[in-house]
Amino acid sequence: MFLNEITIVITTFFSEEKLIKCLKSINGKCKVIVIENSKNNELKKNLNENHKNVECIVLNENSGFAKSNNIGLKMVKTKYALILNPDTILEKDALHNF
């Protein structure tokens, strides 16, 4: 599978430390959409500065896991989408085996 055909959607709520580890395991290999439920604009700033493959949407309220994932999925423009939790660490070739 070509990594440019996958967008990863991650819903978070004050999970920056875990999210950064997750993003490192993705290693900039495909597009990522982060939906942050905590009004944490600092997270968005950090991601914009340090992770060029990541788009962060900060919601005005905690919309919950399902609704937030649906918001992220509506933004996906690739053939495939993969929903991850922020504490997920991908194995080295996990995306190649998707």
Model-identified regions with their sequence ranges:
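Acidic helix N-cap motif at the loop->helix transition within catalytic regions
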Residues: 18-20, 40-49
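A conserved acidic beta->alpha catalytic loop
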Residues: 25, 36-45, 61
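Short, well-formed alpha-helical segments that are part of the catalytic scaffolds
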Residues: 12-28
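Glycine-rich, basic loop-to-helix element that forms the pyrophosphate-binding segment
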Residues: 59-76
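Hydrophobic targeting segments
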Residues: 4-10, 26, 31-35, 56
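Catalytic metal- and UDP-sugar-binding loop of GT-A-like glycosyltransferases, i.e.
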Residues: 59, 84-86
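Acidic donor-binding/catalytic loop of UDP-sugar-dependent glycosyltransferases
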Residues: 88-98
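Short aromatic/hydrophobic "clamp" motif used to bind/position activated sugar donors
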Residues: 81
